[in-house]
């Protein structure tokens, strides 16, 4: 351990490690030598998420608050795979229309059979823009399956329909009716909710934020619910600890060039985070490699 405390040692954290473990490694190697433990694309997306989290125009809703949303738009994220508990909350939220109809008819909420009979197929709008099918499609009011670039473009067009001042980089008119419908549903909602995540890069996140900001500008300046999903248990903690200038790619490059002689890898399989050839070359170039993990991985085998 003593030789890893000397100069020339870098540390690579992990989004599946605890804050305490990541902090201990960062304290040992120094903040400037502590690198993010996920792909460079994910690192860029996480920086965007952190910036949006500090913006007062947006509110990060709890699971209970998600259940109260009365109009929802999901952009480019498979919620069931990334956050199954939130997916369940979304299934609950589409029943809010039925609850409103029951209140108008003076039917108590606890009379579930009567509420369902009254509502029939009436649901609160849940729109999904995605490059693939998802397990929430059965409760969606609108589904648009397009390429990721098209999803981003449609997102910006929806924002521009909500507020003319919102940036609009989309030009296609292929889904103009659906775009108009989704924009009107979000504008009419008492508690609209926009959902995106970092599974498909930062452009989708920026499009979601564009829509939420358009809703905020057209409201009484109350914060708009913007739910940004991350795939691992401590992705946010990892992003808060690793500098924006310290992506994983920079760490691998530093090892290959000889700028760092030793590396400590914390609870991470680097072969899942970057190109195998790049990771292999970096670990081979290092004089000493220390991997701390509870499971056997390609990185521990190296």
Which residues fall in each region the model found?
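Catalytic alpha/large subunits of respiratory electron-transfer oxidoreductases
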Residues: 1-302
